[in-house]
Amino acid sequence: MKNKGLGEFEELVLLAVCILGDRAYGISVKKEVEKHSGRSVLLGAVHITLYRLQDKGFLKSEMGGNTEKRGDRRKRLFQVTNAGMKQLKAAQEVRQKMWQFIPQLKPGS
């Protein structure tokens, strides 16, 4: 995939996967993004984004075990890669640098 940067929604999804650790799968990521962003998101949008992030090398996935609760279906569990962590740290640094140049937010303003 050509574009290796992060869009805003991709960043939220990647952060949610980090927060969830070994419990990151479609629905749990959706709920985590909604909880922290305060907005409603579609499960389909989350799935597309998870796979796009995997294509970019920022996530890896494996199939979890099947459970009776899920009708003996398995769920795909996602994990952030080292490249994904680097990308998140880079995004955080850019945002912090830019925030410091907003006059209304400087100390004493």
Predicted regions and their residues:
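Amphipathic alpha-helical dimerization/coiled-coil segments
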Residues: 83-109
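Basic amphipathic alpha-helical segments that dock to polyanions
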Residues: 46-48, 52-53
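Exposed loop/turn and edge beta-strand positions of beta-sandwich/beta-sheet ligand-binding modules
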Residues: 74
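Short beta-strand/turn micro-motifs at beta-sheet edges
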Residues: 1-4, 65-67
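Beta-hairpin "wing" of winged helix-turn-helix
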Residues: 56-71
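N-terminal helix-turn-helix DNA-binding core of bacterial DNA-binding proteins
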Residues: 3-45
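Alpha-helical residues within the helix-turn-helix
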Residues: 31, 54-55
